[in-house]
Design a protein with these regions (language model features):
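Short coil/turn segments
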Residues: 32-38, 82-84, 101, 106-116, ...
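Alpha-helical "hinge/linker" immediately C-terminal to small N-terminal DNA-binding modules
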Residues: 1-22
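Central regulatory/effector-binding core of bacterial HTH transcription factors
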Residues: 25-85
Length: 230
């Protein structure tokens, strides 16, 4: 309910305040849809604490309303796709990385042995679609559906999709930034020019040195991750 949600928010705010008074002089809140979206965040936090002792980085996981929350000044940094940031005034947009499209299958699926997936590999299979897919992914899904050579059904979100993959109900195309690299599933690159331009947004009114250092730390980690699948 709304009331219980408000109580949880207040409890979290009190706990954060206690943490802040105890150890930190500055706090940077980062809104993202899921934990794995910024895979190098833990390493960035470690590096930042060495360079800027006393700066705390607090992740906020907001699958649906991250943009709205950011615009209400409820977070300092927003992980987003570039398409989400157009026509938003008063923000700075910092390029982070480009992410490709991957096919997610069970590790025992014959397709798991392939190095690259084409449309022909997916024909005859059952594909999960929907779940708030970004524009680049929706266009690929629609192309496959229009071929008439696949079965498909809607999945409400990424976690539901993974459960369905694990239970053998279907396979799925997804952005690489959703990969948690746990090794539970096979993620195989899909042959497409479509990609997702992942960025970090900050408020133009926020000119803290610690914030600039945090953004630069993350950008460097992704720039140096040459062989890491994104």
């Amino acid at each position: 309910t709304y009331l219980s949600s408000m109580r949880e928010d207040m409890k979290r705010a009190i706990e954060q305040g206690q943490n802040f008074r105890a150890r930190y002089t500055d706090n940077i809140t980062v809104s993202m849809m899921v934990r794995q979206a910024i895979y190098f965040l833990p390493e960035a936090i470690r590096n930042l604490e060495k360079e800027q002792p006393g700066v705390q980085v607090t992740p906020l996981f907001q699958y649906d309303n991250g943009v709205e929350s950011f615009l209400k000044d409820e977070s300092d940094v927003l992980f987003a796709l570039i398409e989400q940031t157009k026509h938003i005034p008063g923000i700075n947009v910092h390029k982070l990385f480009d992410s490709g499209i991957y096919l997610i299958v069970d590790k025992n699926d014959p397709l798991a042995k392939k190095n690259l997936i084409t449309d022909e590999d997916i024909y005859g299979r059952t594909l999960m679609v929907g779940g708030g897919s970004p524009n680049a992914l929706r266009s690929v899904q629609q192309k496959l559906i229009s071929s008439g050579k696949i079965e498909y059904f809607n999945s409400p979100d990424h976690d539901s999709t993974l459960v369905n993959v694990a239970s053998g109900k279907g396979i799925c195309l997804a952005p690489g930034f959703l990969n948690d690299h746990s090794g539970q599933f096979a993620w195989i690159p899909y042959d497409s020019r479509e990609c997702f331009h992942c960025v970090l947004c900050t408020h133009k009114t926020d000119s803290r040195e610690s914030l600039a250092a945090f953004i630069q730390t993350l950008q460097k980690l992704y720039k140096d991750a040459v062989a890491f699948p994104l």
